[in-house]
């Protein structure tokens, strides 16, 4: 089936996140209330990647900082749907949406152990701005940014 990107909601993003093995359980357990809090209201956006009628990936973000930047909070692709351009399609769709909405940059945080995500972000022009070191280097948090418009 052809892939298409559509608008979703916090509940759809949460359901997909729960099916993606890389997301933390335990201390950082996924919480539907947190999804609703971060993604509800006019500043939240959930994009769903659909193969036919089945959601196979998502990208969710919101206006976290109120400074003209967009915060890409969470996203992922189901393991069986990887390797087919789903993450790239979601990344581009979110960038296009953010530009059309007037945002100047996109921030995203990831962890060192999420190598595929890091490669994708760097490949498509995201710069590493900051590293929060952890005892286990694989758990280092990385803040990346991509400028969508302008020189500043």
Predicted regions and their residues:
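Conserved N-terminal entry element of GNAT/NAT acetyltransferase domains
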Residues: 1-11, 146-152
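Acetyl-CoA-dependent GNAT
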Residues: 7, 15-73, 78, 91, ...
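Short alpha-helical
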Residues: 12, 67, 112-116
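A short, internal acetyl-CoA/4′-phosphopantetheine-binding micro-motif in the GNAT/acyltransferase core
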Residues: 74-83, 110-112
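Conserved acetyl-CoA-binding loop-helix of GNAT-fold acetyltransferases
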Residues: 77, 83-96, 119, 123
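Conserved GNAT acetyl-CoA-binding A-motif
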Residues: 91, 98-110
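Conserved catalytic-core motifs of GNAT/GCN5-like acyltransferases
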Residues: 107-110, 122-143
């Amino acid at each position: 089936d052809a892939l298409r990107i559509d608008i979703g909601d916090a509940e759809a993003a949460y359901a997909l996140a729960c099916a993606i093995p890389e997301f933390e359980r335990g201390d950082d357990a996924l919480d539907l209330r947190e999804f609703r809090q971060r993604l509800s209201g006019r500043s939240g956006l959930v994009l769903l990647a659909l193969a036919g009628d089945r959601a196979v990936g998502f990208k969710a973000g919101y206006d976290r900082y109120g400074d003209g930047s967009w915060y890409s909070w969470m996203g992922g692709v189901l393991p069986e749907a990887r390797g087919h351009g789903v993450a790239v399609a979601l990344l581009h769709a979110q960038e296009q949406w953010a530009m059309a909405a007037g945002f100047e940059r996109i921030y995203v945080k990831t962890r060192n152990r999420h190598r595929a995500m890091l490669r994708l972000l760097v490949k498509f022009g995201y710069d590493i701005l900051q590293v929060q070191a952890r005892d286990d280097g694989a758990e280092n948090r990385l803040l990346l940014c991509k400028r969508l418009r302008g020189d500043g």
